[in-house]
Amino acid sequence: MSTLLIDLKGKELEQEEVELLSHPLVAGLILFTRNFEDREQIQELIRSVRQRVKKPLLITVDQEGGRVQRFRDGFTMLPSMQAFQETLSATEQVSFAKEAGWQMAAEMIALDIDLSFAPVLDLGHECRAIGDRSFSSDVKSAVNLAINFIDGMHQAGMASTGKHFPGHGHVLADSHLETPYDDRTKDEIFGCDLQPFQQLIAQNKLDAIMPAHVIYSQCDSQPASGSEYWLKEILRKKLNFQGTIFSDDLGMKGAGVMGNFVERSKKALNAGCDLLLLCNEREGVIQVVDNLKLAKNQPHFMARQARLQNLFKRRVIDWNDLVSDLRWKLNYRNLADIQIRWLDIQAAKK
């Protein structure tokens, strides 16, 4: 049973990485800026992975837009999600959100990448980890923009991933650096932060969800990424979510309360995660592949494997054909203009 997504050290594939990626526990990989030099190089790296690892791998990236865009040179400057509401009219917002989703997904698929973890469904912009990665502080606006962004992704042939369930926007701490605590009541969380996830699930827009490394102390003592309450009781049963549940990166400091890397992996799986990200911790990856034991014949593991198959890209796009497309050309200019205007607005406030 494949469950781990791991990372690569650099711009070329190492033999140790071929062996790790070939391990039965490993389902795929996530790419970072350190793996990228230019488009030709990243395409060659992906081609090497596909050829040298003799099984289908889910290749992923965080190419959200704004400050979270791993590949820049030679790619569209994608706007931060907040930029749509801050720089455009109501009609333009939904139109360009859809185009941004399509543009991002089409460019990644043309590299032979299956999935970009997007969109961010957190509300508000105060959290250091989120900031302008979120669409809005308003539920209705965030949902409307997210629907259009996802529709663009789906049109290009990419599955969507809503993050960070049930909402990371109301904590100031950064879960990359520590475990944040959200002390609001259950009613406050369910009436606000949970709403984008609940509404998008109801409209069948989300193919995958990534929970937060945040402890919601009035609801459960575990981070959502390791919480049966959030993942089994709320996400699966109450919201009837049928898609894939990714853990956020188990190498992050916010996951540290769940123990060592093997313990974190076990807790996330037992809580209900299907696929586990473990990045920037090569020794941790080795510990997990050596010590995590999974039973292949259990029904919920079989369901996890079936859900994994729905995440692979749904079409093939040739890069040269893409950049010759008028839609891509118009988006390349217009989306960059939106981000430049947003950066100018931010600079003027300083």
Curated annotation (Swiss-Prot):
Cellular component GO terms, alphabetical: cytoplasm
Any GO MF annotation of the entry: beta-N-acetylhexosaminidase activity
Keyword set includes Cell wall biogenesis/degradation: yes
Keywords, ordered alphabetically: Cell cycle, Cell division, Cell shape, Cell wall biogenesis/degradation, Cytoplasm, Glycosidase, Hydrolase, Peptidoglycan synthesis
Keyword flag Iron-sulfur: no
Name of the top EC class for this enzyme: hydrolase
EC number in record: 3.2.1.52
GO annotation (BP), single: regulation of cell shape
Pathway: Cell wall biogenesis; peptidoglycan recycling
Active-site residues, as the UniProt record annotates them: 176, 248
Subcellular location: Cytoplasm
Gene3D superfamilies named in the record: Glycoside hydrolase, family 3, N-terminal domain
Residues given in the record as substrate binding sites: 62, 70, 133, 163-164
Function: Plays a role in peptidoglycan recycling by cleaving the terminal beta-1,4-linked N-acetylglucosamine (GlcNAc) from peptide-linked peptidoglycan fragments, giving rise to free GlcNAc, anhydro-N-acetylmuramic acid and anhydro-N-acetylmuramic acid-linked peptides.
Similarity comment text for this entry: Belongs to the glycosyl hydrolase 3 family. NagZ subfamily.
Record PANTHER family: BETA-HEXOSAMINIDASE, BETA-HEXOSAMINIDASE-RELATED
Name of this chain's protein: Beta-hexosaminidase
Organism: Haemophilus influenzae (strain PittEE)
Phylogenetic classification of the source organism: Bacteria, Pseudomonadati, Pseudomonadota, Gammaproteobacteria, Pasteurellales
Protein's gene: nagZ
